[in-house]
């Protein structure tokens, strides 16, 4: 037969084919690297060379849990604008922060969030992860009544309920020689508050004095978020991402969704019949029945889950860092404690309104908010073709700002690496220090700005002031000796921050 006359497909032919493929791919990578380094629209911006030719630099630091520090270090080394990926740049100036995230003229397209940071990995970004500006505005509009001043005042009793229970637990356990785990107890407090305020869900972490299943699952899924995001940067490796995710993390994703869906369905059926109105009330269907449409239900799941996480992780980080920096600065802690104890004759006088009158308390909270790393992702957005701090950024280029770099820059803040609450005081305050008068406070936007400004800004301040005032009115805080804690070295973050262990003693000063 004719086909038998053809020579066999021998090993030599296979070797030649493989050689051709390798040479061709090497040529492709070389020419692409040269183009990205010297001819790409972003080639004029400085930065690590490996970041200019590949996403490897980005992925390495993100997977190591050190992304905010890597970007801040690059900006410190290379200047105000740094290329951090082939098609991505980071800025450090307050003007760039305003241009990228601030409000824009209605006739201009907003800088839209990148889809790569849509943790939901589907068309339902909910609120926080929603990349489409129009859909984000619609959800934000629906939720806005839940964050009005009147609505927040109605939630204050819930806030006190959990903070008082935290104080009760510390009165019993906090004075022991070995102290208590600061991140553990703060996590429990914040997840209790957030779940109840988000959609009347009781976690009972403080009551039961143990990690609720939801929090354990959330922690287990922490690193998986970044692994998933990086797989989107390397599409050819996406099928292999399961090899890099622990079995527990994969199971966690399924369990957390199923458990949350059940809780959400229960909440929907209780519309208007709950102990207090929560943030989710505005989105519940009038018929009090879970939507039969899968897409609509998925959207509600996303929003509910994001409300819970947004009300848990940022406040927990804020509380944790504030106490840490106060303990590292005993004179500041002493000054704040005296302000609080002299302002209130008894514990019950402490409310969101009365605590807001304490200038040094607010200054300490502002300073910890400034100096802590802030958001993990840098909030990457896509340029519509616009000016950023005097430079035209072509359409399609991904931009982000580094809150950590802004805070660390001596061009923005004097003694930028030091915890100095005095920088936030007014001139008429006894502790005002004129050396901080030239600080560029426009670089301090911890809740973002413009269309994406955090809706929970006000309640976050309420929580933080009341928490710190009640804790320092009641306790003398001490860090257990012998701990070698270096935040610049030990802190890690993936989907959320992994806070280093700190043992703290809460010694009761007064009887509550």
Curated annotation (Swiss-Prot):
What are the recorded Gene Ontology BP terms? biosynthetic process
Q: What is the top EC class of this enzyme, as a single word? A: oxidoreductase
Matching entries from SUPFAM superfamilies are given as: Cytochrome P450
Q: Where does heme bind?
A: 454
Q: Which PROSITE patterns does this chain map to? A: CYTOCHROME_P450
For this protein, the Enzyme Commission number is 1.-.-.-
Give cofactor(s), names only: heme
Instruction: State which pathway it belongs to.
Output: Secondary metabolite biosynthesis
Query: Which UniProt keywords are listed?
Result: Heme, Iron, Metal-binding, Monooxygenase, Oxidoreductase
Highest taxon of the source?
Eukaryota
Kindly give the Pfam families that the UniProt entry links to this protein. Answer: p450
The Gene Ontology terms for molecular function here are: heme binding; iron ion binding; monooxygenase activity; oxidoreductase activity, acting on paired donors, with incorporation or reduction of molecular oxygen
Function, in words: Cytochrome P450 monooxygenase; part of the gene cluster that mediates the biosynthesis of wortmanamides A and B, reduced long-chain polyketides amidated with a specific omega-amino acid, 5-aminopentanoic acid (5PA). The PKS modules of TwmB are involved in the synthesis of the polyketide backbone, whereas the non-canonical C domain of TwmB is a bonafide condensation domain that specifically selects 5PA and catalyzes amidation to release polyketide chain.
Q: Provide the family line.
A: Belongs to the cytochrome P450 family.
Q: In its UniProt entry, what is this protein called?
A: Cytochrome P450 monooxygenase TwmD
Q: Which organism is it from?
A: Talaromyces wortmannii
């Amino acid at each position: 037969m004719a086909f038998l006359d053809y020579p066999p497909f021998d090993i030599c032919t296979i070797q030649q084919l493989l050689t051709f493929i390798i040479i061709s791919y090497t040529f492709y990578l070389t020419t692409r690297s040269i183009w990205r380094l010297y001819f790409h629209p972003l080639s004029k911006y400085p930065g690590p060379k490996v970041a200019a030719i590949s996403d490897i630099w980005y992925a390495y630091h993100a997977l190591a849990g050190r992304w905010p520090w890597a970007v801040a270090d690059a900006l410190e080394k290379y200047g105000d604008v740094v290329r951090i990926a082939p098609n991505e740049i980071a800025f450090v100036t307050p003007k760039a922060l305003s241009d990228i995230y601030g409000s824009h003229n209605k006739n201009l397209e907003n800088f839209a969030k990148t889809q790569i940071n849509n943790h939901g990995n589907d068309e339902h970004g909910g609120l926080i992860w929603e990349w489409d500006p129009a859909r984000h505005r619609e959800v934000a509009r629906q939720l806005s009544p839940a964050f009005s001043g009147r609505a927040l005042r109605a939630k204050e009793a819930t806030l006190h309920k959990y903070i008082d229970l935290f104080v009760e637990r510390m009165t019993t356990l906090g004075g022991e020689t070995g102290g208590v785990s600061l991140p553990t107890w703060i996590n429990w407090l914040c997840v209790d508050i957030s779940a109840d305020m988000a959609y009347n869900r009781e976690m009972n972490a403080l009551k039961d004095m143990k990690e609720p299943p939801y929090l354990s699952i959330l922690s287990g899924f922490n690193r998986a978020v970044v692994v998933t995001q990086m797989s989107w940067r390397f599409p050819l490796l996406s099928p292999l991402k399961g090899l890099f995710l622990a079995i527990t993390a994969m199971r966690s994703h399924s369990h957390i969704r199923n458990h949350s869906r059940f809780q959400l369905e229960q909440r929907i059926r209780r519309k208007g019949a709950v102990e207090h109105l929560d943030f989710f009330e505005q989105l519940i269907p009038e018929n009090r029945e879970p939507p039969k449409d899968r897409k609509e239900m998925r959207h509600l799941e996303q929003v509910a889950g994001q409300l819970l996480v947004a009300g848990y992780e940022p406040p927990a980080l804020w509380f944790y860092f504030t106490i840490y920096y106060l303990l590292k600065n005993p004179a500041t802690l002493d000054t704040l404690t005296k302000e609080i104890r002299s302002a209130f004759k008894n514990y019950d006088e402490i409310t969101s309104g009365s605590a807001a009158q304490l200038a040094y308390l607010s200054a300490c909270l502002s300073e910890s908010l400034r100096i802590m790393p802030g958001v993990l992702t840098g909030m990457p957005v896509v340029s519509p073709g616009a000016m950023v701090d005097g430079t035209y950024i072509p359409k399609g280029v991904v931009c982000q700002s580094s809150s950590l770099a802004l805070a660390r820059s001596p061009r923005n803040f004097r003694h930028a690496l030091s915890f100095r609450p005095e920088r936030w005081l007014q001139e008429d305050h006894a502790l005002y220090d004129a050396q901080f008068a030239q600080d560029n406070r426009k670089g301090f936007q911890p809740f973002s700005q413009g269309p994406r400004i955090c809706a929970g800004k006000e309640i976050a301040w309420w929580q933080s002031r009341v928490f710190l005032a009640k804790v320092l009115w009641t306790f003398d805080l001490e860090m257990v000796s012998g701990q070698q804690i270096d935040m610049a070295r030990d802190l890690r973050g993936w989907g959320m921050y992994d806070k280093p262990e700190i043992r703290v003693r809460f010694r009761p000063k007064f009887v509550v």
